[in-house]
């Protein structure tokens, strides 16, 4: 996924298309509207679950390591701004009862915050679980008692639960390092963990939230392991984002193809991500413009950016 500005490329494609000046004007106005949209994504989980590595892998950045600003009104939740993609990184839970209470209050406050239009500020919550841990009590408490009661409408479409560190879920056993994927024994174990998490949440809240498992990977001076199922995670993030906001991701998705190479292949997640982004283009820019089937002409530079 190439590092071009998708909104600039859309504008170029429109200006070069054989449309009336009136339609061009409407289309360009719609692009400005799309560009002005904001996504607010809250990322939370237990200490050591891999929130920072997940943020860095998804969005081709290392801001989560260095931190770029703290909002003192939200109990040390860090705010990372990638243009109009705004990531709220909550401190990890599980470091003591008093700290957990403090951090939970910060999360509740953020979930109840409204934007300038009086709508919930947070579009989606990504809860990251530590796949190598047997004790997920802190995570269940966070999901069932903090997030779900405070997230408001459509919780099943606004909460994503992702089990990280799939590669070490069985202490490193049954992970095929050469092919960077789980062998059958580990795959069965992970699928059971997904089913168990789903069942526990359903029993406590009545909601049906489908977790996934993945590995954010790592890189240091001596070694590197590519992510696994990161494309599945991004696919779900994009899928559950309102259509009019999805394009905001396009400028910030990691351009490193190795990040997206390995998955369970249940779907072609990379293809589905592109389809979701194109859907956002089609729906967002054509409002009020008479272009009909001509919309395909717009996907010159824009198609390169997404693809």
PLM features per residue range, with description:
Residues 1-86, 91-281:
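Conserved GTPase G-domain substructure that encodes guanine base recognition and part of the catalytic core
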Residues 270-307:
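Membrane-inserting effector segments that mediate pore formation, membrane fusion
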